[in-house]
């Protein structure tokens, strides 16, 4: 899995630093970003899927969504568009440079993110997430 891949890549980098042989470092760094982001995004996704979760946001998050997207419906429509366009993930992130929330479609775990952004919500739209229950109807999964 992603955790084992991340740990293995980190071990390779540590060994390379110790030996001074960096021939496999580029591949290991790629494995750090791929496996690290895969692990972090799946962790966030499962935290978001809490059985007691769901419904519309409240409090500070709702206030910020309304400020940055105009309304909850505006955010939701844009998030669903990101999920429909993405090959892998749709993310709601906080962009500290622009100081606002953004919806981001991401095709691979480590591509498409804004540097320095903090993911708040993740929707896994890889086929393994929905195909068993929804078949090719990804839109139905997104709507659920």
Curated annotation (Swiss-Prot):
<dbReference type="Pfam" id="PF00081">
    <property type="entry name" value="Sod_Fe_N"/>
</dbReference>
<comment type="function">
    <text>Destroys superoxide anion radicals which are normally produced within the cells and which are toxic to biological systems.</text>
</comment>
<keyword id="KW-0479">Metal-binding</keyword>
<keyword id="KW-0560">Oxidoreductase</keyword>
<dbReference type="InterPro" id="IPR050265">
    <property type="entry name" value="Fe/Mn_Superoxide_Dismutase"/>
</dbReference>
<dbReference type="InterPro" id="IPR019831">
    <property type="entry name" value="Mn/Fe_SOD_N"/>
</dbReference>
<feature type="region of interest" description="Disordered">
    <location>
        <begin position="1"/>
        <end position="22"/>
    </location>
</feature>
<dbReference type="InterPro" id="IPR019833">
    <property type="entry name" value="Mn/Fe_SOD_BS"/>
</dbReference>
<protein>
    <recommendedName>
        <fullName>Superoxide dismutase [Mn]</fullName>
        <ecNumber>1.15.1.1</ecNumber>
    </recommendedName>
</protein>
<dbReference type="InterPro" id="IPR001189">
    <property type="entry name" value="Mn/Fe_SOD"/>
</dbReference>
<dbReference type="InterPro" id="IPR036314">
    <property type="entry name" value="SOD_C_sf"/>
</dbReference>
<dbReference type="GO" id="GO:0046872">
    <property type="term" value="F:metal ion binding"/>
</dbReference>
<feature type="binding site">
    <location>
        <position position="128"/>
    </location>
    <ligand>
        <name>Mn(2+)</name>
    </ligand>
</feature>
<dbReference type="InterPro" id="IPR019832">
    <property type="entry name" value="Mn/Fe_SOD_C"/>
</dbReference>
<keyword id="KW-0464">Manganese</keyword>
<dbReference type="GO" id="GO:0004784">
    <property type="term" value="F:superoxide dismutase activity"/>
</dbReference>
<feature type="binding site">
    <location>
        <position position="42"/>
    </location>
    <ligand>
        <name>Mn(2+)</name>
    </ligand>
</feature>
<feature type="binding site">
    <location>
        <position position="124"/>
    </location>
    <ligand>
        <name>Mn(2+)</name>
    </ligand>
</feature>
<comment type="similarity">
    <text>Belongs to the iron/manganese superoxide dismutase family.</text>
</comment>
<dbReference type="Pfam" id="PF02777">
    <property type="entry name" value="Sod_Fe_C"/>
</dbReference>
<dbReference type="InterPro" id="IPR036324">
    <property type="entry name" value="Mn/Fe_SOD_N_sf"/>
</dbReference>
